[in-house]
């Protein structure tokens, strides 16, 4: 809703469903380009910083870890990392607020690490290289159409996580586009998909 409100100040009138379908999983750079391409509005230089300030304030009031993720990460017996379209600052704050930062020390890769973000495979390939793992041996857990596309393009296995509150209105789009991709409504479902997660 923060992005919707900030864009409305510039007379870009979109709703929650539009954001979910067109911006979820994309870097801010990509969002900026999409706004220009679709609405012919060039976001001012100050827009990103102002948006992130308000967003982080909202995070501090509302952000919570999804049910079961801490238990899963605590018991995971294999290498894992975080590869996200968010900025380093937003990622660090989100992990701190949700109590997950200790799980990802030195294992965080963001959109700023690559020239092309999702749906290009660059971020996932970069993360795999840094982790010393072949793409074919990686399992990506993604919640967005752009992310699932990127994982498939990277030659990685992928599962579609649908348990986040922010995903309303987007699940069917991903399932329809990728009917062969396993769906994970809850983190406990990952254990059934990946025995090594126990």
Feature roles, as predicted:
Residues 1-21, 38, 153-154:
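Active-site neighborhood of HAD-like aspartate-dependent phosphohydrolases
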Residues 1-5, 30, 34, 50, ...:
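Alpha-helical elements of Rossmann-like donor-binding domains used by nucleotide-donor carbohydrate transfer enzymes
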Residues 12-21, 40-50, 102-105, 135:
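Short, surface-exposed acidic
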Residues 74, 78, 87-198:
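Asp-based, Mg2+/Mn2+-dependent phosphohydrolase catalytic module
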Residues 57-82, 88-92:
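Short, acidic loop-to-helix structural element flanking the phosphoryl-transfer center
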Residues 23-27, 51, 64-68, 86, ...:
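Short beta->alpha linker loops
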Residues 13, 33-71:
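Metal-dependent phosphoesterase signature
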Residues 6-7, 27-41, 94, 128:
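Helix-loop "lid/cap" segments that line or gate small-molecule binding pockets
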């Amino acid at each position: 809703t923060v992005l919707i409100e900030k864009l409305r100040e510039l007379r870009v009138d979109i709703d929650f469903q539009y954001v979910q379908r067109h911006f979820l999983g994309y870097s801010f750079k990509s969002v900026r380009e999409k706004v220009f391409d679709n609405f012919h509005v060039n976001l001012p230089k100050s827009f990103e910083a102002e948006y992130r300030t308000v967003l982080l304030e909202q995070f501090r009031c509302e952000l919570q870890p999804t049910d079961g993720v801490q238990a899963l990460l605590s018991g995971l017996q294999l290498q894992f990392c975080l590869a996200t379209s968010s900025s380093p600052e937003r990622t660090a704050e989100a992990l701190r607020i949700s109590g997950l930062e200790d799980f990802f020390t030195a294992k965080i890769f963001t959109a700023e690490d690559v020239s092309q973000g999702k749906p290009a495979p660059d971020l996932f390939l970069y993360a795999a290289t840094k982790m010393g793992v072949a793409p074919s041996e990686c399992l990506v857990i993604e919640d967005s159409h752009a992310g699932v596309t990127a994982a498939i393009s990277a030659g990685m296995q992928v599962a579609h996580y649908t348990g986040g509150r922010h995903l309303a209105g987007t699940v069917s789009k991903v399932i329809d586009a990728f009917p062969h991709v396993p769906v994970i409504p809850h983190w406990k479902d990952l254990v059934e998909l990946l025995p090594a997660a126990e």
